[in-house]
Curated annotation (Swiss-Prot):
Its EC number(s): 2.7.8.13
Name this polypeptide is given: Phospho-N-acetylmuramoyl-pentapeptide-transferase
Cofactor(s) of this protein: Mg(2+)
Domain of life of the organism encoding this protein: Bacteria
Name of the top EC class for this enzyme: transferase
Membrane topology per record: Multi-pass membrane protein
Assigned keywords, A-Z: Cell cycle, Cell division, Cell inner membrane, Cell membrane, Cell shape, Cell wall biogenesis/degradation, Magnesium, Membrane, Metal-binding, Peptidoglycan synthesis, Transferase, Transmembrane, Transmembrane helix
Length: 357
């Protein structure tokens, strides 16, 4: 929006023409918005008794969290949208693709959270309907980018740590994009089980995507680093920084002991947005490395279900795996910080892959 005012109202703020400055302003704006509205949101939702529903078969240590308000993802989404609309060039179609996922998946998460609170159970929206709506939005997103944008119509798959790192997969790319969107959103959702556990890996992952979006817009740098050239992808860096700032602002209140949880409205929206950005940048497989914590959590749930159905035995004492460590007696803050450390290491490994061959 500021770009529009600067151009057509002749304000002549040259600083707005530089991506790094707009990215920094975007981060700071979303961060301070969350710092400002966070306490009001927490107070209001406590007053309305919009508390996190604790499942009966969960860790006993979680019973102390039952009076913690949830749906903090609402102010995460708000601050991201505000900063994005304020600082991004809104004529860039990539921005609207990600915003559509942010809002669409956030709405599904909101309905899920609302049903949990209203009926006071941890089930929320039925699983089949949840995946149905997530899938519908995912396929609409994929169709839109295929129809409207030739720059990302390529169906080449970029494989990290590979000398010949681009492979044509044709129509399989549609299914890959679908699994990236739906899978990432649910992976973040599964990871969001401890105070601050999910948001910091989200921040790390987003920082990685920020760098790639900057590299991808330069044909020489993208060729040198073996990343897909995506024209005008630098605007995504500003959106990414809005996510980082919002995440840091949310972590201010979500760090142990948490004063608010993001709920499904936040986890589905953030996960879906990261998946969408990775698809636009053709970094679907690198996303798996960057978001290895989310992958690990998801695999732990899948293995637990398969093992119990086939062997009638559990691999983990409780899934997702962060609950397994809780049941073993490891303190929650210790689990959280160790997961953060692993997430940071995975980010660094993923960045090394850009020029390893």
């Amino acid at each position: 929006m500021l770009i529009f005012f600067n151009k057509y109202l002749h304000i002549n703020l040259n600083i707005l023409s530089y991506i790094p400055y707009r990215a920094i302003f975007s981060l700071l704006t979303s961060f301070f918005i969350n710092l400002y509205i966070g306490p009001y949101f927490i107070y209001y939702f406590k007053k309305l008794q919009k508390y996190q529903i604790i499942r009966n078969n969960g860790p006993k240590t979680h019973y102390s969290k039952k009076n913690t308000p949830t749906m903090g993802g609402i102010f995460i989404i708000f601050s991201i949208l505000f900063s994005t609309i304020l600082y991004c060039n809104l004529s860039n179609i990539y921005i609207w693709y990600v915003i559509s996922i942010l809002i669409g998946y956030g709405l599904i998460g909101f309905i899920d959270d609302y049903k949990k609170i209203k009926y006071k159970n941890s089930q929320g929206l039925k699983l089949k309907w949840k995946y149905f709506f997530l899938s519908i939005i995912a396929f609409i997103f994929i169709c839109m980018i295929k129809i409207n944008n030739k720059d990302i119509i390529s169906t080449e798959l970029i494989i990290p740590f590979c000398i010949k790192n681009d492979f044509e997969i044709n129509y399989l790319y549609v299914f890959l994009s679908y699994f990236v969107l739906v899978g990432t959103s649910n992976a973040v959702n599964l990871t969001d089980g401890l105070d601050g556990l999910a948001i910091m890996p989200v921040i790390f992952l987003t920082c990685g995507l920020t760098l790639i979006s900057l590299f991808s817009d330069n044909i020489n740098i993208s060729h040198y680093l073996h990343v897909h050239y995506v024209k005008n992808s630098t605007e995504l860096a500003i959106l990414c920084m809005a996510i980082v700032g919002s995440g840091l602002g949310f972590l201010w209140f979500n760090s142990y002991p948490a004063k608010v949880f993001m709920g499904d409205v936040g986890s589905l929206a953030l996960g879906g947005s990261l998946g969408a950005i990775a698809i636009l940048l053709h970094q679907e497989l690198l996303l798996i490395i960057m978001g290895g914590i989310f992958v690990f959590e998801t695999i732990s749930v899948i293995l637990q279900i398969i093992s119990f159905k086939i062997r009638k035995k559990r691999i983990f004492q409780m899934a997702p795996v962060h609950h397994h460590y809780e049941v073993k007696g490891i303190l929650e803050p210790l689990i959280i910080v160790r997961f953060w450390i692993v997430s940071l290491i995975l980010l660094l490994i993923s960045l090394i892959s850009l020029k390893v061959c």
